[in-house]
Design a protein with these regions (language model features):
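Catalytic center-proximal scaffold of phosphoryl-transfer enzymes
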Residues: 1-294
Length: 294
């Protein structure tokens, strides 16, 4: 199947780069493998991508674009799967970039344990929180203060920018005393205080200019796997996730070559011969072929 034959094209010369940025998130996919709904659950497809820096998008004023991106995706279930996922990312970095030049790899995400664990497997890496999710937690907590919401929001950001963890903690505890719904404040405490060092990096390191992982999940995975009412087998979703990344990494023509190669390999296994004719493959056949395998 496609999941077993996707090759990595090792560059002839390693690139020199001081900093790399990795952003990660996940897509939640509906499962369909049985006749009855109770047999079908949900699962996630993990996504991460590496880039070297951001630059102005020449086509859209005021918008940044990522330079030299490379995508990774798939189900990678359980702790062993997470380890395999990040080891794949580390292998790509080792094969592509000069380790003598590389100083730091910044990992950004929403605080999920599997993303945080990247620092265990990716050399020279530091975890940084996604400001988008941090803003959501702050807004939700501040809104519990009703008429004093704006003041609460300003104070929370003040303690972050002044690196005052103890004051941040004390202030959120005071918020709890008068909040009608304490849950958003508890969630903010857990997220911010539990990832305080990562929060400080995100808000004080000038190299970090925001994380767009949620948008990438939408365009790379959700657009095909979860945005419309549909169900997937886990094998099918894993293969489609990898296909979507392969097309992003190498282009559509290379994707067609990959499917042709996959078909040839399966045919050789069935016939026990290397004498296989090369066939033309359309994009419609590609998607049908991978769906049928699932």
């Amino acid at each position: 199947g496609i999941a077993d034959v996707i090759p990595f094209q090792t560059p002839e010369t390693k690139k020199k780069c001081k900093y790399l940025f990795v952003e990660a998130d996940e897509d939640h996919i509906a499962e369909q493998h049985g006749r009855w709904s109770k047999e079908n659950k949900g699962f996630i497809s993990r996504l991460a991508y590496i880039y070297e820096y951001k630059q102005e998008n020449p086509k859209v004023k005021g918008r940044k674009e990522l330079v030299n991106t490379y995508y990774f995706s798939g189900l990678y279930e359980g702790s062993k799967g997470v380890r395999a996922f990040w080891e794949e990312v580390q292998s790509y970095i080792e094969a592509t970039y000069d380790s003598d030049e590389l100083q730091r790899v910044f990992i950004s995400g929403d605080g999920a344990a599997w993303i945080d664990s990247a620092t265990t497997y990716v050399d020279r890496s530091l975890y940084c929180v996604d400001k988008f999710h941090m803003t959501k937690y702050i807004n939700a907590a501040a809104n519990q203060m009703l008429d004093e919401a704006e003041e609460a929001r300003a104070n929370l950001y003040k303690f972050i920018y002044k690196k005052q963890r103890s004051k941040f903690k004390k202030y959120t505890e005071e918020m709890l005393a008068s909040a009608s719904n304490p849950e958003p404040i508890y969630e903010l405490q857990s997220y911010a205080l539990g990832n305080w060092n990562a929060v400080m990096r995100s808000y004080h390191n000038k190299l970090l200019t925001g994380c767009s992982a949620e948008g990438h999940v939408s365009s790379v995975l959700s657009d095909r796997l979860s945005s419309r009412p549909m169900g997937w087998s886990q094998i099918g979703a894993d293969r489609m996730s990898k296909l979507r990344c392969y097309e992003r990494n190498y282009g559509r023509e290379k994707l067609i070559d990959l499917i042709r190669y996959s078909r040839e390999q399966r045919s050789m296994k069935r016939k026990g011969t290397d004498n296989i004719a090369v066939e033309k493959v359309s994009m419609r056949e590609i998607m049908t072929d991978q769906y049928d395998q699932s």
